[in-house]
UniProtKB/Swiss-Prot annotation:
This is Leucine--tRNA ligase. Its EC number is 6.1.1.4. The keyword Metal-binding does not apply. It catalyses: tRNA(Leu) + L-leucine + ATP = L-leucyl-tRNA(Leu) + AMP + diphosphate. It is found in: Cytoplasm. Keywords: Aminoacyl-tRNA synthetase, ATP-binding, Cytoplasm, Ligase, Nucleotide-binding, Protein biosynthesis. GO terms for biological process: leucyl-tRNA aminoacylation. It comes from the Bacteria. Gene3D superfamilies: 2.20.28.290, 3.10.20.590, HUPs, Isoleucyl-tRNA Synthetase, Domain 1. Belongs to the class-I aminoacyl-tRNA synthetase family. It comes from Mesorhizobium japonicum (strain LMG 29417 / CECT 9101 / MAFF 303099). A motif ('KMSKS' region) lies at residues 631-635. One of its GO terms (molecular function) is leucine-tRNA ligase activity.
Amino acid sequence: MATERYNPRASEPKWQKAWAEKKLFEARNDDPKPKYYVLEMFPYPSGRIHIGHTRNYTMGDVVARYKRAKGFNVLHPMGWDAFGMPAENAAMQNKVHPKEWTYQNIATMREQLKVMGLSLDWAREFATCDVDYYHRQQMLFLDFVEKGLVTRKSSKVNWDPEDMTVLANEQVIDGRGWRSGALVEQRELTQWFFKITDFAQDLLDSLEGLDEWPEKVKLMQQNWIGRSEGLLIRWPLASDVAGEHELEVYTTRPDTIFGASFMAVAADHPLAKKAAETNPALAKFIDEVRHMGTSVAALETAEKKGFDTGIRVVHPFDDSWTLPVYVANFVLMEYGTGAIFGCPSGDQRDLDFANKYGLPVIPVVMPEGGDAKSFQITEEAYVDDGVMINSRFLDGMKPDRAFDEVAKLLEQKTIGNRPMAERKVNFRLRDWGISRQRYWGCPIPMIHCEDCGVVPVPKADLPVKLPDDVDFDRPGNPLDRHPTWRHVKCPQCGRDARRETDTMDTFVDSSWYFARFTAPWAYEPTDPRAANEWLPVDQYIGGIEHAILHLLYSRFFTRAMRATGHVDLAEPFKGLFTQGMVVHETYRVGGASNNGRWLSPAEVRIEDAEGKRRAIEIATGEEAAIGSLEKMSKSKKNTVSPEDITDGYGADTARWLMLSDSPPEGDVEWTDDGAAGAHRFMQRIWRLVSTAAETLAGVKPAAADSGEAGAVRKATHKILKAVGEDIEKLGFNRAIARIYELANVLTTPLNQVAEGKADPALQGACREAVEILVHLIAPVMPHLAEECWETLGGTDLVAERPWPAFDPALVVDNEVTYPVQVNGKKRGDLTIARDADQGAVEKAVLALDFVQKALEGKAPRKVIIVPQRIVNVVA
């Protein structure tokens, strides 16, 4: 009888080696079984992973192992999203080359992931900084150029004058560069763009067909694409400004035109620039605006400011009515025409602006049934539906009808021999700017020639490799100052030319990697046959923070790759799941006001003093403040490394805990107590199986219909069916709860087996039940499952065995319980044979004591029976 404790440190490496030797997880493209592609968003090799990172990999692994057992040819690959700024920062701070830093981190993190026992196809591994990978990315780029999906144009960017680089909107904090602290400038730079707007309508329409995506993600993408139907109105200028006669404004609410009290233009609008030429104060204001972040979020949170240019426009329906034109810091040139008309009564931002600058507020929409004479707007705009007021010929109309009426009338009026207005569909989505003034990224394969212009690098000359001999001793892009790399001959005329020194946005790298995994050995970016067979990804797993950009860019890429013949599909991901985070409390000594030090969980001990938890820094004995539960992050040091758990408890404990306590879409709190509890259950499973194994090893699974053996079989098969359904729905915590239930069911029978007290029928039922238990735990605790199977006499691996099939006859209850109501109020229940007819149900209900008491000896007026559901007695 085996009674030793299960030793994960000995067991887990043994089974990982066994799986690797048999290459169980290497998918074959020619396998005739039905395909299933499960993928977790691949990691950035930042140095080390923490336990929070592994939660989504564990989720994907459970699905992969389950689907293999169900007979699918499963592709479950892993790679590295390896380009990006952190490597350059490390190069500057630590005097280490980005390539060396990146590949060292990959080696470390690969070993960390392998310790977790993930069933990954490592044969397909690649990093996006591998020359083989970015060579194919350059091939795609040139195909996109040829197809007209790439353009080069001027765009406003956040420029850090100290680091001499473009910053993403998220890297601008309070108007300063996140790293240098320098005041950020808005500059016009000529950059490369992917024409994602060519697919805007399709990207929007196709969201409807993504049935296995979270609704919130689809809504976020819908809002980002931002389709609107509106009117482009040409407002006449009261007097010409440097040859300009009109101001074009796009609006989705032309019905509110009689509520207009001002116009606002972006700081870089042509009208603003011309007005600033003769107005130094305006020029200074425009310069201030240019030091703000360019993101919509930055503009929404910033104080709304404006500057009256002195320019006036004439109202389209009243020549005697003029409105002031302001330069405003909340208007972006990239949206619409870079100009808006402000209707304060119907928009809160416009109302705040009008109140700040003393502009008129004219209510033009009020609730139906309201009093137009008394209806006023002061501090809160009215943004709901209603009826038009104070709008002359529009009064009494609904806004939709007023929209059409304004459009019809202005389309008939002319200004400069053109209609004063035209209907227009607008999108918030903008073309994707991919230029980055950085070294550690995929080089853009273009060449600048003074005679031929910008020409592509011939495919035969690819890849354009990054030079290794670069230095990071000063800010800016090392490629710009490389003595030889950027000097090249023009492929068209042969004269001296220079390479493009911008590299691609790292979002490009992650926008097609899922396709490369289908045939990473192919010379072309994809093997179309393999890509079309494997794609779309059946289950994609990753954080909600990627709901917009990464997922939208990937959807664009599959469309662009279809247009260029690399794949024959539009949508990359069939099913999408956004998992919650692993959170941990924080510890800090010194406090926020004193720039206190963050401590890692390993640096503190938790004490219980008079019922209150205290954190003590081990090294100093100083008390640390215990903070709230937060996402694990290096900056606050509240991370737990996988080794902290696997060295003591084993990988299966970590896997079990991450999936057991919370729904997978919710956050899970990592605690030492939780880890200890998961480990205790692992040991309990081992004891249950190993103590009965000596007897059960020689027993064959046997069917039983009655007695204790029948009850064991029935409970086991019902749980088997339920666990399969739970995993299919990614309800991992529910599946685990049912495994706990099965362990409880089997505790007494297995103890009887171990003690020699079980008859042959119970032994046969227990052998079958234990086999099922082993297979049920295998997706979550695969190492323990293999150890249990070996102990039971198994000679093969659980990882290559099929998922057990439940007996349909055992999962159907022979009885049904009806809630019984009297006059619509529940009084009790009736349990009766499931196949009882309505007459038998009615007879049994009327015989119940609480029903007879309610009827007081009288016959019921009616008995309503909803089969298999509910009974209502009407007295």
